[in-house]
């Protein structure tokens, strides 16, 4: 996505690159929200598969399902952050995307102060803080995009370009998906390894998945 967007911006102008950027963003966000809804519905089955060691404690299964349904909302949010970050990086504002993890970490740290016996699930504030962190990250990048005037076009400009360059935009979008699949497959290999680790860790003592996560970090 980044090389194609950068190429269009350099060779075909900012307006055409913006149209391509917007179309890819909309399609990715739509796909991820559909996927998130599917995960929300099927989360109990996913937890049974990912953490078979929890099945002997129904309370843990229910709490894990609740927390997972909240934190899965972060998936489309961080994807939006990554795509918006492409625009800031190509414009030379590398620090903007690099700063966003600080926002998430700060949100989670603040969430730690709300952990107490009031909550049925004590780690619930952390799950909520993760989602809030993602939302704040998006707002931060959008503010920076506005501040640095990365996308400053009127509707007439974009409509005229879209009519003239519709075939080129479609071609580049198709190229994006073709290049996305091999990259997703490569990343999927790592995720399979983490998946197996999680399944095995769930069969060990309480907190093993957390220990594995922190060790990996």
For the regions a language model picked out, list residue spans one by one.
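Membrane-embedded alpha-helical bundles of multi-pass transporters/translocases
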Residues: 1-217
